[in-house]
Amino acid sequence: MLTAIIDYSSGNLYSAQKAFEKITASNNLGSVVVTSDPKIISSADRLVLPGDGAFPSCKAELMSSEAYEAMVYGAVEKSRPFLGICVGMQLMATKSYEYQETEGLDWIDGEVKKIDPKD
């Protein structure tokens, strides 16, 4: 089984890769690859979308990457297991208000809002 960590130029790839390699090796769960190759992403058994930075810039990077359509195909059309990490998780929401209002993938009904430090 293959776990594909999606590289769209906006993620904590190294730490995610090392963590998944350790988990898959110790549990005999297949292999892990960091990739932006649509063919590999669309055929992977599991998908991971990391993210590091601001929601608007991560969304723009993802939408302009070759990986986007393959990710949607694998996660939505093929219903493969999908994990978002950090901003990768936030991108699944309906929208975000970080810096500016930005539409998300709308896979999860919800909005990402800044937490007031006073709370």
Regions found by a protein language model. Name each.
Residues 1-81, 87, 100, 106-118:
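N-terminal beta1-alpha1 cap of cysteine-dependent amidohydrolase-like domains
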Residues 86, 90-92:
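Glycine-rich nucleophile elbow surrounding the catalytic serine of serine-hydrolase chemistry
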Residues 94-97:
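Short, conserved catalytic or interaction motifs in soluble domains
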